[in-house]
Amino acid sequence: MALRLVADFDLGKDVLPWLRAQRAVSEASGAGSGGADVLENDYESLHVLNVERNGNIIYTYKDDKGNVVFGLYDCQTRQNELLYTFEKDLQVFSCSVNSERTLLAASLVQSTKEGKRNELQPGSKCLTLLVEIHPVNNVKVLKAVDSYIWVQFLYPHIESHPLPENHLLLISEEKYIEQFRIHVAQEDGNRVVIKNSGHLPRDRIAEDFVWAQWDMSEQRLYYIDLKKSRSILKCIQFYADESYNLMFEVPLDISLSNSGFKLVNFGCDYHQYRDKFSKHLTLCVFTNHTGSLCVCYSPKCASWGQITYSVFYIHKGHSKTFTTSLENVGSHMTKGITFLNLDYYVAVYLPGHFFHLLNVQHPDLICHNLFLTGNNEMIDMLPHCPLQSLSGSLVLDCCSGKLYRALLSQSSLLQLLQNTCLDCEKMAALHCALYCGQGAQFLEAQIIQWISENVSACHSFDLIQEFIIASSYWSVYSETSNMDKLLPHSSVLTWNTEIPGITLVTEDIALPLMKVLSFKGYWEKLNSNLEYVKYAKPHFHYNNSVVRREWHNLISEEKTGKRRSAAYVRNILDNAVKVISNLEARNLGPRLTPLLQEEDSHQRLLMGLMVSELKDHFLRHLQGVEKKKIEQMVLDYISKLLDLICHIVETNWRKHNLHSWVLHFNSRGSAAEFAVFHIMTRILEATNSLFLPLPPGFHTLHTILGVQCLPLHNLLHCIDSGVLLLTETAVIRLMKDLDNTEKNEKLKFSIIVRLPPLIGQKICRLWDHPMSSNIISRNHVTRLLQNYKKQPRNSMINKSSFSVEFLPLNYFIEILTDIESSNQALYPFEGHDNVDAEFVEEAALKHTAMLLGL
């Protein structure tokens, strides 16, 4: 299944064997009561109560006398510890232990079993206790009221230096939250006692709320109160120095007026109380380290024919409401859907019906979310019991007493990528898999292998393009928290294709009103995201439009011989050298193909320009990041782009078992060579539309394969349309490898006339042939006549200078001779100092004779 649950804790394996061993030791010493093992007969009494910030798990069970026993499982030492035994037959529904394990707070209610006498005072439904447990000593009653009370100790960040004051939250069913400040002191050695236990200072930090959630990892309290029928979400941050702040408030377009009272993550939502307080509404807040803030909401279902839920992407300034149709709805249904925090994604699922993965960081396009519905084995394998999403990726199954770490399964996502027929699922699975791997070479190799075999599998987007952009993005994503705003993570800008079975409505929402002036850590990142939503018009995403314009200018200047300062061009080419050096340092093994082994000045210019522009882009928007780090990020990003292209070519080269002799023009191309030519053509299409650089040598290899695999008319069409780019290296090899048969002469001539002038001048010297001389002559004449100004001249021709009685040719040669001898003459034809009017005359006669067959 796409969601992989890795068990970190299991009551049945990590606690129950220890309890049995303790019971066996007790009975062996004669302290036990003997008889049947109560734990075997009353296993339901053992359940998880709470998971604290440090990962320790508090559980409870009834001993053979009906007493309430509290235990703790240390996640670091993987050892169990008995905390406290309360000698009354009551039911525990909330418990918390401070970080030093010196104080225990618990709320108990009357047992629901028939025949049990009432252990509580008349008029009291809930008893809340504070117990000294190091060692067990005094017990203080904090509350004895006719409403439920939940308890939660605050955990400071610095656990190595215990604070003299402990803070305890009490959350009341009567819709208020209090914070108790508990001073402790050590007496008689290590004995810890509560100071002034008769009067514990307390603050009321929230009231009149209808919903609250505790974030144990970040020590945050989220709650919603109703103001004029509006649901206002607020957040309180607790700090290690014992202070707290109201961080923000934001209105939510949801109705909670008739939803009752709901708490999330204040201990385990044990099924007995879950049913009482949920009323089928699901609401939770998820955050991650990038500064995201999502509110997931599912109202009570009016009809089981379809499910509707909303996600408020508060850090993006909009909400999305998803409606999914259910198939094969039976009478037996789970009471609500489950939301799970998977860091970069939010999982939404209803066992047996659907499983959705929502992209938190890039929610704009629906195709970047994964929607699995209907009879899918990836859905059927999900747990059918309700799961409780704790902080981070921790997930608690209250029914079984198991604590999981929820992860996305790379293998399942790859399998989905390979097997699904829908473009939207391919897109989402590709992004999910790359997020899981984040640069893992094995994963990338598997994806490249699949793309090579299915390069035309998608009609809505270019697979190669999407893979290169997404994988390059993830290679540098972790370097800075703002990378998602600066680099594109996808090549797709719009998506208009409907997702089967999904209806989506997107709405703008109000941004939070921040209540503090200075921010650190997560809050700084969230505030940065909100500022980006307010002011980033247009978006900051890098694109190659400036590089495209500058590159075309440089190429144009090169053709006209008017290139700007040598220092500017040299700096650009130095950038390209740095990229290639960085790439080669990351890949020490030999390459199968002749990529990165030639100059290819045009690609190096493009590469260097991209380095320069991307570095400027980062420097503008990454304030406070060292320039050296930014330069390295730029080199890593562009190196990754080029490396992926090399990897795709080499994967196909290896797959088809090609060798170095393929690079010589000695035979027609094979099916294997054509397959590599085809994939290189697709790479070229993918990079051209995004104007991305190619590894030097790519065009040479592509052209060589094209010459060998394509008929002449197809080859020339590819050259004329820009699919094949003639390079000096490729043409020189062609001139040297091919003899002057009629077929090869036709090919050579067709190639030479299509060469850029600068390359053509060099190539013509390598071919001792009338055609070559003719081309050289044409170019020479063109240069001479460019600035020729007609002047009065003697109409008499000195015939003694010419050996041929052909007046047009004689007249033309005389003009060339005059130009060469006058001040109008241009610089000599580059590389051909012996090219003059006499050479032109001789070339013209040879070419004419060849055409006439003389």
Curated annotation (Swiss-Prot):
Entry's Gene Ontology BP terms: positive regulation of amyloid-beta formation; regulation of proteolysis
Keywords for this protein: Golgi apparatus
Tissue distribution of the protein: Widely expressed.
Modified how: The protein is first synthesized as a holoprotein form of 98 kDa and rapidly processed into the gamma-secretase-activating protein 16 kDa C-terminal form, which constitutes the predominant form.
Disulphide linkage map: none
Other known facts: The gamma-secretase regulator activity is specifically inhibited by imatinib (also known as STI571 or Gleevec), an anticancer drug that selectively decreases amyloid-beta protein production. Imatinib binds PION/GSAP and acts by preventing PION/GSAP interaction with the gamma-secretase substrate, CTF-alpha. Its role as an activator of amyloid-beta protein production makes it a promising therapeutic target for the treatment of Alzheimer disease.
Function text: Regulator of gamma-secretase activity, which specifically activates the production of amyloid-beta protein (amyloid-beta protein 40 and amyloid-beta protein 42), without affecting the cleavage of other gamma-secretase targets such has Notch. The gamma-secretase complex is an endoprotease complex that catalyzes the intramembrane cleavage of integral membrane proteins such as Notch receptors and APP (amyloid-beta precursor protein).
Name of protein: Gamma-secretase-activating protein
Origin species: Homo sapiens
Highest classification ranks of the organism: Eukaryota, Metazoa, Chordata, Craniata, Vertebrata
